[in-house]
């Protein structure tokens, strides 16, 4: 080969001109031959190995499909999955449009394979707002528990109110005194009942007219406790039921007890003020505000009015109207006595 010859050192000085020309003419050919050899060393496009991952996987599965018939169904589903999720993404595409296209692809895949949801990794695709709100409520179970407990408490409170009202409406043959003692016990017994319908019952409040209230007040002033016969007669007279009369008397007795307790505190306060700001009888003067009226016959009205609270009322009046005027009157009296002496 000429390449072996060219590898030897060439001495151009010993050559003739003709030989030089021949050697010079051979040099470009050698370069061309080297370029051809380099091209032969490079792999041509025809000799490149062409392969696809899906084809390789199919070639690997071919012997298994021939051996087992059950694997054919699995291969078919795998092929569907491989072809279904092919998504051609264009880098120049708008991100919003790409997301919409991806969502549409997932929806199509879910419809083809009869899937409940398109993809478990994207649970927000294709879900209505009602389900999202349901998931939101499920994420906060404490709120639901608290609301349920609040409703149960309201129902229990309403049930207790209704039961106390029902307990007050017992048999009309019993006396009112026994009914007052059995109010708490009857409500406790009925609170243990397991019927939820009784707890939800609501009693309508009875509205009494003025004439009915006045008659009931007059009867209450005469008698605090009524027998069954008296209660039935009064109910027939006022066009009310015996239960309504009985409940009214119970409420009125409770109100009277509360008023008595408040009156006791007021009386004790008045007595305390009377003891602190009391004036001796020898130095006490008659005030025009506190003068006791007399009749035409000269009879003092104090003797006609029997009230054990005269001293306390006088002391309270002194406290309310102030001690400035009383002190001034005492000073005048002292100066008058000094002049008389």
From Swiss-Prot:
Q: Which InterPro entries match?
A: HD, HD_metazoa, HMX_Homeobox_TF, Homeobox_CS, Homeodomain-like_sf
Show the Pfam families listed in the entry: Homeodomain
Q: Where in the cell is it found?
A: Nucleus
Any idea which GO molecular function terms this record carries?
Answer: DNA-binding transcription factor activity, RNA polymerase II-specific; RNA polymerase II transcription regulatory region sequence-specific DNA binding
Q: Where is the composition biased (Basic and acidic residues)?
A: 153-166
One GO cellular component term of this record is: nucleus
Q: Which domain of life is it from?
A: Eukaryota
Biological process terms from the Gene Ontology for this record are: establishment of mitotic spindle orientation; nematode larval development; neuron differentiation involved in amphid sensory organ development; positive regulation of cell population proliferation; positive regulation of glial cell differentiation; positive regulation of transcription by RNA polymerase II; regulation of mesodermal cell fate specification; regulation of transcription by RNA polymerase II
Q: Where are the disulfide bridges? A: none
Ranges where the record places region Disordered: 1-78, 139-209
User: Which family is this sequence assigned to?
Assistant: Belongs to the HMX homeobox family.
Query: Any idea what this protein is called?
Result: Homeobox protein mls-2
